[in-house]
């Protein structure tokens, strides 16, 4: 689950701020916290959280969303330090525009959203859930056993063109 929206910081309602941070940060915190005892017992514990390219960039009218994704990155980096001694790695994915439930309303509203992000992408398209799944599969694999505290950008080259 994830939420975007909230509007400009100046006019954002506190309830909108709280709701976005609750879904995007507090839920991630609670899930990570609940998993820690199990991960410590695992021979190869892995945490992979979902951030956003907004962890590096920012967008007007996206103050709560951008803040929430910075918090996910900070939490994940902290978990990498706290759990490393147990062999647990903690990383996060930084997706660009991916065709998901979050982007569905924008895609359904007309061609502008897809055209905007496709033009920004070096690959000329939006990402698919399988693109994120592949990145997650890599981070949970033994090939990534020495990667921790890292944000893996999966954005089709958007940040390279920015």
Predicted regions and their residues:
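Short, small/polar-rich loop/turn modules that mediate ligand/substrate recognition or access, typified
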Residues: 84, 89, 147-149
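Active-site loop-to-helix junction immediately N-terminal to the catalytic Tyr of the SDR YXXXK motif
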Residues: 12, 58-66, 78
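A conserved structural motif in NAD(P)-dependent oxidoreductases
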Residues: 121-132
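Residue(s) in the substrate-gating loop at a strand-loop-helix junction
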Residues: 52
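Active-site helix of classical SDR
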Residues: 32, 68, 76
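Substrate-binding pocket helix/loop in short-chain dehydrogenase/reductase
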Residues: 8-9, 16-18, 113, 117
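Short C-terminal tail/terminal secondary-structure segment
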Residues: 57, 137, 148-162
